[in-house]
């Protein structure tokens, strides 16, 4: 319903998450216009790129245990900020290092940090959407979130393809760095839902 969508679009705590998922997937797709060429430049044929991607992805999944531990300690805001900051740091490092033809170990480390950031943010944001959205508009909130995720995938591919033709890899990495920095600045004030630990005493006082 139109009213529920308005509640979602105008909600003071949801727009940062919606912006975030759009930026995350825009950066992901645009970045991947550049990364394969950097790996080839570093001496790794395209058919062997999985030798870098697979270990980086698997190692990043091992880091998710820290996310769940941090959530139990009520440190979810720190996890979210760390993920966004790490995403920005990776884009900035690629921007600075790409003209110098970074080696495979450097690229592998940057991809590991990227996947750590990506997995942290992918695991954190949908949970925050469902917990911060008004109960009557939770479905609409998740629908808007998923729509912006899809739009980010499209925008990243289109933007990356256009920029690499117009200005080369550096233009793509400037754009991804600016987007990640914008998200970091705007997302720094993201409100967190009350933790279960803090909610319990409040409920007890109510009785």
Predicted regions and their residues:
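A membrane-interface helix-boundary motif in multi-pass transporters
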Residues: 162-180
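Pair of pore-lining "gating" transmembrane helices in MFS-fold secondary transporters
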Residues: 11-31, 112
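Loop-to-transmembrane helix entry/capping segments in MFS-fold secondary transporters
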Residues: 46, 135-145
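Short amphipathic helix-loop junctions that connect adjacent transmembrane helices
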Residues: 33-49
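Juxtamembrane intracellular "pre-TM" segments in multi-pass secondary transporters
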Residues: 1-20, 204-207
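Multi-pass alpha-helical transporter architecture, strongest
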Residues: 176-207
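Helix-to-loop junctions at the C-terminal end of transmembrane segments
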Residues: 62-77, 164
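C-terminal transmembrane helical hairpin of 12-TM major facilitator-type secondary transporters
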Residues: 78-125
């Amino acid at each position: 319903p139109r009213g529920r969508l308005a509640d979602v679009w105008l909600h003071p705590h949801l727009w940062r998450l919606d912006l975030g998922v759009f930026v995350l997937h825009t950066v992901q797709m645009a970045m991947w216009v550049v990364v394969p060429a950097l790996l080839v430049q570093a001496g790794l044929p395209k058919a062997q790129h999985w030798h870098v991607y697979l270990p980086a992805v698997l190692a990043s999944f091992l880091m998710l245990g820290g996310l769940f531990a941090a959530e139990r300690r009520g440190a979810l805001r720190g996890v979210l900020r760390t993920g966004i900051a790490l995403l920005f740091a990776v884009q900035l490092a690629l921007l600075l290092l790409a003209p110098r033809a970074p080696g495979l170990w450097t690229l592998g480390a940057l991809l590991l940090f990227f996947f750590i950031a990506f997995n942290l943010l992918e695991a954190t944001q949908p949970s925050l959407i469902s917990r911060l959205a008004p109960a009557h508009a939770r479905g609409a909130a998740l629908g808007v979130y998923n729509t912006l995720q899809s739009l980010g995938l499209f925008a990243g591919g289109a933007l990356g393809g256009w920029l690499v033709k117009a200005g080369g890899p550096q233009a793509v990495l400037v754009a991804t760095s600016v987007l990640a920095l914008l998200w970091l600045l705007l997302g720094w004030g993201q409100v967190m839902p009350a933790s279960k630990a803090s909610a319990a005493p409040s409920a007890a006082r109510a009785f």
